[in-house]
């Protein structure tokens, strides 16, 4: 496979042909990647089967072709698990073993992502299972990592090697244990995985499981025979890794496993020597006992084991939660790293405008130079206008020559030998910044500053959050206060309205009454008038005066009534005014109420829901009340449980002590029996043996009765204990169910209130933060507007400087860079918009969660009545349990009294044993005497050895004396020789010589005699030494014989003991048989007596019948009837006898079975000391487990706090990133504004060009009026100017159309930019053409031919430039696509190994290019 580096090198490096040739690029692209390949890849990613099959039907399409990222459509389909697409590709035909850039084939990818069906399909097409990726892993490794047992089974069935190792030497079993997957470990072991396989550091799977705290996986490995004693390269074993992991469960498991292995080895080494000597019936009894021991386990151990298992499960859950939290923390850290990478990319892209500004400054300097040249030209035109004919032409020619020189120097400065695509590095490497040499120190300072700014943003965000929370709480409080005020105002207004309505009713009643009175007065007045008229006719003066007085009174009353009516009307008006004001107030209040109702409508809906929920919960609580009537609160229940468990443990201890005492008593009894029987068998008279046997039988019978009573009591106590355990289990289950229901359905009121407070505080803080953020946003907006205005000014100035005269190549380069920047910024804008949308969705989700939390907090509470009822029921159960405990204590006291009685009897038996021991002392030799005799023998041996040593010392001294004598003899011989020589020399006489010889002979004889005596003595000593050695050997043989005799006696004693045991067992059996036989004999005697009595009765009846027969004649029928009845009775009696015998046999069998059960119970019972030790060890382990649980809970709480802190930091960083993105959006808006300004400047420049053309026309007209000879030239110039005007107008129209299109659609921005650049190039070319035409007009007389030649050359240049631009664009876009794909994958977190390798290649290439 071709690497990414080689492809990039091919794209960047110039070929043998020209790099600007598009044919070469097209050929390489068609060979490497095709549009059909791209379509196939997209269809494979979408899972469109029809599209995939249609594309595959075309020629030249290969589904295994790799893209820039190093993957093919075949790999994509396998990784996504699309079975239909995979079938289509496989049926089309492909090499199944094709690999991607990471060395993985399709089988690897299907196993990695857990697609078992795709894996099965690939295996059907014979995809190899032994292929390895760049990390040395097979498909089985990936399946284990994906936790897919079905794919593992498929791979193992198709011959995948279970013990294959990767680069680090890890097998699939090692990876499974490292990732804590016990089921997969068991599956791999069942498939033949090596449990003790090692990696490159000599670490086994067990060591890694202990290090990572995978208790279940370690248990699986230990069960399947993992070696605990293996060491790694550093000399550490599995227990060391378990200590590093701080997992007590694993340490305990390893300890128990090592102890079991050690015990097994010891048993294997020692072997059972005594069991070989035992009889066959003893072996059978031992096997039966072992089976019964295995079947029966005490309840206390079961309870403790259950509790331990519960604690271990809790530990496992806590460990799993810790792992999940660690995974979350790692994920958050990865997100942080990705966001930091994105921020770095944004910073690098921000630095691009700086480089562009630097380039623009350079262009500004060049434009200043061109402006100066233009000024000189304008001066020349102004000075040349009024002069004569010959002189100005010469001056013009000089100026044109100067301008030609100036224009020729400018391209020479731009390195003519270098091709244009090599001038700007930013064209080929858009992500590299062409800034001047910036040091790493400045970059570090920038990063530090940005870090400080991020920290300030983080602090400000924290403060904003707190403020918003406070504001939220404040607003909630205000809403509540407003709601209360609204209700209060409603009530007041209702009361006032009622009062006003009552007052109106009273006023109306008064009005009606006053109107009635007025009507009465009117009628009365009319009546008076009539009466007065009548009396006036009569003319009585006195009556008239009285009537006048009455009239006055009536007028006064009428005026008072009218005044009252006016007052009432004024009161009514006032009340109406008040009612209007109240109505206005009511309207305002209604509006406020509506506003508050809109704000609190959701609250009311929530309250209704909560009310429904409360009703439902009340019903559930009522139902639970009945269930909880018998339950107990957790604290009291735990105290009760602890007290009950303590009492039960004490009782169990006492029972165990009683059992141990009972077992010890039985053991002592057995030993006494064995000793007594052995003594009797060897050295006791038969009479004494029978007496002792009778006594022992009596005692054994009494002890058997007591044992039976004790066993019955023990059974009753065990039943009581079992009942207590059952009650305890029921209570535990009830408490567990209640705790689960309380945890799942109810939340404490304190927690809900605290959550409400915290939410209120959060809302207030958020509101405050919102207000502050809005203020800051307004301030920043103002600053941004100010900066935009300044930027507009600067851009206008720059555009004015740039727009006068700019080189075409530089302008094209700038435009290409701007296009690339625009495209990148658009993509960034889309990404930022997506991120903003995601952030808004997250905010909505948080708001919904907040509302749901509020609902749940408000709806959950705990009533007090149920709690009191539960308390009462629990108190009653506690009293019941106390009573049961008192009864159990009484029973225990009875058992203790019986144990004391047994101890007294044991003391009596001990006394008998002492008597037997005294008899043994009298009959046998004691060990002390034997040791004394042995000591005397050893002393005699020591004395003999000492004497032997003395004899050897004397022998050595004699040998030394003999040696000294030999030396003296030799010296004397030498002297004799010398004397003889002297005699010979001096001629001594013969007599003397003879005498000397005699003397010498005498001395020789004496010496020889001495020698013989000494040799004789030596021989005697040697003989004595030999005799001592023989005596020593004989004594040693005697000692060995004595030791053998002692060993034989010990063996005989052991055999005698075993025989005594067997005899005692037989004696017990015989005694039982005797008892049974005696009982049977007594039963048979009683039955015989009954039968005798019945026989006598029958004989008397027969005699009576015979007498009757003799006295009276009886018919034969009666006699036969009597015979039949008698025969029937006889048969019935026989059947009854047989049934009784069967019952006897059954009872005997049951008795024998019960006796065997008793013996088995005695043998299988455990000592109390061992039980206490086990219990203490378990309690210690439970305490350690609880302590570790507390520590781990504290650690988990700390970790949760850390995770919450990390989440807050992540949120703050996200907010900071969002702020940065908003800033970048502002920068984009600035960029667009600058672009619009540039376009406006271009239009202004075109206007200026038009004005310049007009001025030029005027000058030409003046020249025509002055010079008639040059009319033809001026006409041609005018025609050319008109053509140029038309072209400028066309260009202006096209620019306007382009602007309209830009405003209409943002999709065609790139095409419009290209057109603008082409138009700008046309304008510049027209300028150059104008200059050339001016030179031609003044220099030659045939302008049309030269104009056509210039036009052709310009068109060729334009074509060349367009081709170069197209080639540069293609290369630029290809490189951008490569960079973007890898950077986007890195930013999105897809940092696979292939992406990392690609990024490393890019960095290396960058460094090479920079160098």
From Swiss-Prot:
In residue numbers, the region (Disordered) covers: 1-30, 263-301, 1006-1031
Which Cys pairs are S-S linked?
Answer: none
Q: Which residues carry this modification: N-acetylmethionine?
A: 1
* Observed effect of gene inactivation: Mice show a high incidence of inflammatory lesions in preputial glands. Cells around the lesions showed resistance to apoptosis.
Q: Where is the composition biased (Basic and acidic residues)?
A: 282-301
Subcellular location per UniProt equals: Nucleus; Cytoplasm; Cytoplasm, Cytoskeleton
Question: Keywords for this entry?
Answer: Acetylation, ANK repeat, Coiled coil, Cytoplasm, Cytoskeleton, Nucleus, Phosphoprotein, Repeat
Coiled-coil segments = 299-379, 442-624, 652-1380
Tell me which PROSITE patterns the record gives: ANK_REP_REGION (PS50297), ANK_REPEAT (PS50088), T_SNARE (PS50192)
- List the Pfam families: Ank, Ank_2
Q: Which SUPFAM superfamilies match?
A: Ankyrin repeat, Myosin rod fragments
On tissue specificity, the annotation reads: Highly expressed in heart, liver, kidney and testis. Weakly expressed in lung and skeletal muscle. Not expressed in brain and spleen.
A biological process (GO) of this protein is:
intrinsic apoptotic signaling pathway in response to oxidative stress
Q: Where are the ANK repeats?
A: 69-98, 102-131, 135-164, 168-197, 201-230, 234-263
Which terms in the GO cellular component ontology are assigned? Answer: apoptosome; cytoplasm; cytoskeleton; cytosol; membrane; nuclear envelope; nucleus; perinuclear region of cytoplasm
A molecular-function term among this protein's GO annotations: transcription regulator inhibitor activity
Q: What induces it?
A: Up-regulated during cardiomyogenic differentiation. By apoptotic stress in a dose-dependent manner.
Q: Where is the composition biased (Low complexity)?
A: 13-30
Cited InterPro entries = Ankyrin_rpt, Ankyrin_rpt-contain_sf, RAI14/UACA, T_SNARE_dom
Post-translational modification Phosphoserine, affected residues: 280
Q: Which domain of life is it from?
A: Eukaryota
| Function, as annotated | Regulates APAF1 expression and plays an important role in the regulation of stress-induced apoptosis. Promotes apoptosis by regulating three pathways, apoptosome up-regulation, LGALS3/galectin-3 down-regulation and NF-kappa-B inactivation. Regulates the redistribution of APAF1 into the nucleus after proapoptotic stress. Down-regulates the expression of LGALS3 by inhibiting NFKB1.
Quaternary structure, from the entry: Component of the apoptosome complex, composed of APAF1, pro-caspase-9 and UACA. In the complex, it probably interacts directly with APAF1. Interacts with LGALS3, ARF6 and ACTB. Interacts with RAB39A.
> What is the protein name stated in its UniProt record?
Uveal autoantigen with coiled-coil domains and ankyrin repeats
